[in-house]
């Protein structure tokens, strides 16, 4: 999977808060540079934030899939009508890494290019979605193999999943063929997202 920024080691509990935990395996995660810089030394335990190591974050967050450069549209927002989402925890997560940051107004000077990369991927995803719709007799198996190569080259798994969410065979490919995708976060038959921690009432994702 393509990485647009050099991965950095991020500490859930910052080193200047508890240096003794700086090498603890359960205290480190991979993060992109802009996310890491934005987080700084703020703590983000799974009790107050949604983390992909513990939660099915695809259920908590969404962003507009659009080919139009409208201000803010590619930014993350909390999925509506999800009664099991902890709104405070979701907002904490968005704020932690500035997932809703809109860099369109300062594009020429921006150093945080997450918006640019997301937008470019959205355009590609929508083009390929149109291709699938316009070719009713397309070889779906061949299309899926081609699509997998594109997803591997561009990244942004969630954009591709959301764009093709109504195509079962593509959902299956995205869930089953990408290493690191948590199998417990998706139904084993429909490959639709499901709560990852259903035992936790009020915060099951």
Give names to the regions the model predicted.
Residues 44-45, 51, 73, 135, ...:
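Intrinsic-disorder/low-complexity coil detector
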Residues 1-30, 42-59:
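Histidine-centered nuclease catalytic patch
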Residues 11, 49, 55-58, 71, ...:
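Histidine (H) residue identity feature
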Residues 91-205:
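C-terminal, charged low-complexity interaction regions
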Residues 73-103:
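Charged, amphipathic alpha-helical linkers/stalks
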Residues 21-33, 58-82:
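Short Fe-S-cluster ligation motifs
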Residues 36-37:
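Detector for the c-type heme attachment site
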């Amino acid at each position: 999977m393509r990485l647009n920024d050099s991965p950095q080691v991020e500490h859930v509990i910052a080193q200047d808060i508890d240096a003794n935990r700086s090498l603890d395996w359960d205290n480190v995660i991979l993060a992109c540079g802009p996310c890491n810089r934005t987080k700084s030394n703020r703590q983000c335990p799974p009790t107050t934030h949604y983390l992909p190591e513990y939660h099915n974050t695809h259920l908590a967050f969404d962003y507009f899939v659009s080919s139009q450069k409208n201000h803010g549209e590619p930014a993350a927002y909390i999925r509506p009508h999800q009664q099991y989402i902890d709104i405070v925890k979701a907002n904490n997560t968005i704020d932690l890494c500035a997932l809703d940051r809109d860099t369109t107004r300062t594009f020429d000077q921006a150093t945080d290019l997450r918006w640019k990369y997301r937008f470019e991927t959205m355009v590609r995803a929508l083009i390929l979605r149109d291709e699938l719709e316009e070719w009713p007799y397309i070889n779906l198996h061949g299309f899926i193999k081609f699509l997998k190569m594109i997803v591997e080259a561009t990244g942004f798994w969630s954009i591709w999943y959301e764009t093709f969410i109504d195509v079962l065979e593509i959902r299956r490919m995205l869930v089953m063929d990408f290493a690191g995708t948590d199998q417990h976060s998706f139904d084993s038959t429909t490959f639709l997202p499901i709560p990852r921690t259903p035992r936790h009432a009020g915060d099951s994702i």
